[in-house]
C-alpha cells in the first residue's frame, strides 16, 4: 500500500485484539473505520462494532447508532430507539448527543416535545465548543425557543459559529444585518455573510443576495 493502507490494517489488527478484551474504545474505533474509511467501508460491520461498544456503555457509539437509526437507510428507522440512545449519551455529557437530543426535544421526535429542555441541552452542548450546538443555542435566543428572545446573545453566538465555518450561522448574521433585526442595519456586511453561505450552495442566501443586488 501507500503507507496509509498499511497503517489502517495495523490499526484494525490492534483494535481487533483489544476488542476481544471488550475495550469499548477499541470497538468504537473499529466502528469508525468501517463507517468512514473508503477502502474498508462496511456499514453493517460498523453497526456490529458500535453495538458491542454500546454494551460497554460507550456514549460515542450510542450517538453513531442514533444517527443510523434516525436515517433509516442501512437499518430500519427507529426514532424511539435513537431517542433512548441520545438521552443516555446526552445525560453523560457528550456534546454531539446533547445537541441532537435537543433537536429531538425541540421537534417532538420520539414523541416527547419540551422546548425548555431542548434549550438546556443546546446550552450544555456548547460547553465543549460544539459548533452545531452553538448555532442551535443562537436559534433559541433569536426565536425565543425555550427561553426569552435575546437578539444580542443570538448575534454573538451566530457570529461564533460563523467564524468556525458554519454557514447556516453566516446566513443568520447576513439576515440580521440585512433587515436590521436585533442589530443596526448594514447591507454591505449582510452581503459579505450571505456570500459565505451562498458559496456553500445555500439557496436562501443566493436569493437574499439577488434581492440586495437589485436594490443597488
Residue ranges and their predicted role:
Residues 29-36, 64-71, 98-107, 134-143, ...:
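Hydrophobic face of amphipathic alpha-helices that form TPR/SEL1-like repeat modules
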Residues 196-216:
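Terminal, low-structured helical/coil segments at or just beyond the last alpha-helical repeat
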Amino acid at each position: 500500500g501507500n503507507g496509509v493502507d498499511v497503517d489502517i490494517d495495523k490499526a484494525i489488527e490492534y483494535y481487533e485484539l483489544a476488542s476481544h478484551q471488550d475495550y469499548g474504545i477499541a470497538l468504537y474505533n473499529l466502528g469508525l473505520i468501517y463507517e468512514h474509511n473508503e477502502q474498508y467501508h462496511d456499514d453493517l460491520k460498523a453497526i456490529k462494532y458500535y453495538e458491542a461498544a454500546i454494551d460497554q456503555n460507550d456514549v460515542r457509539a450510542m450517538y453513531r447508532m442514533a444517527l443510523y437509526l434516525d436515517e433509516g437507510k442501512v437499518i430500519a428507522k427507529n426514532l424511539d430507539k435513537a431517542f433512548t440512545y441520545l438521552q443516555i449519551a446526552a445525560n453523560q455529557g457528550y456534546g454531539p448527543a446533547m445537541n441532537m437530543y435537543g433537536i429531538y426535544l425541540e421537534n417532538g421526535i420520539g414523541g416527547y416535545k419540551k422546548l425548555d429542555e431542548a434549550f438546556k441541552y443546546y446550552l450544555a452542548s456548547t460547553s465543549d465548543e460544539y459548533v452545531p450546538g452553538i448555532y442551535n443555542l443562537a436559534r433559541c435566543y433569536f426565536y425565543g425557543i425555550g427561553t426569552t428572545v435575546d437578539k444580542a446573545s443570538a448575534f454573538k453566538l451566530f457570529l461564533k459559529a460563523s467564524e468556525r465555518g458554519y454557514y447556516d450561522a453566516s446566513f443568520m448574521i447576513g439576515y440580521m444585518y440585512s433587515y436590521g433585526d436585533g442589530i443596526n442595519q448594514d447591507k454591505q456586511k449582510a452581503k459579505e455573510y450571505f456570500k459565505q453561505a451562498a458559496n456553500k450552495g445555500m439557496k436562501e442566501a443566493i436569493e437574499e443576495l439577488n434581492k440586495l443586488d437589485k436594490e443597488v
